[in-house]
Amino acid sequence: VGQWKRPWYFKKEESESMHQAVQRESKLTRQTAGIIDGSTLGKIEIKGKDALEFINLMYTNAFTKMKPMTSRYVLMLGEDGMIMDDGIICKINDKHFIATTTSSGAPKVLSHMEEFLQTEWPHLQVFLNSITEQFTTFNISGPKAREIISKVFTDIDFSNEKFPFMTFKIFDYKNTQARIMRASFTGELG
């Protein structure tokens, strides 16, 4: 995926076909939980006094009323008006955002943003930084995902009231800054 290598599936037995393995993994994820290494997803840090205005111009969504420490699914259009990429925007504050992109889309999204900053909105004070390689990403899905993750991050309350859908938290985990987001790509609670 992009410049990353990622397994397609894991065989349980040598005789198991790719189709059988994927069906087994999908069924188990829907019944219990599954994990995927999503580190290949692009991550772009957007900072500066005009960061909010910039993302309002770059994406199809409106971000003016978005609260800090919340996330939103986003679409980026190309100059032809067609969907160029999708991802999630995480708002730390009005001057600091993290944008995720598709795995193969990160370079073109960053280039697209930089081009518009230089040619269309050079007056905006915005700084972009690719942070894809700085963060490992794991997606844990399925009905037992919260139960599993609660055993790892025991200081975080994962209840709906304390950790609403499409919010995220930044915290220290074993002397390392970590981010955890509640989102859903498969239709469960997130």
PLM region descriptions:
Residues 1-190:
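Glycine/proline-enriched, intrinsically flexible loops and inter-domain linkers
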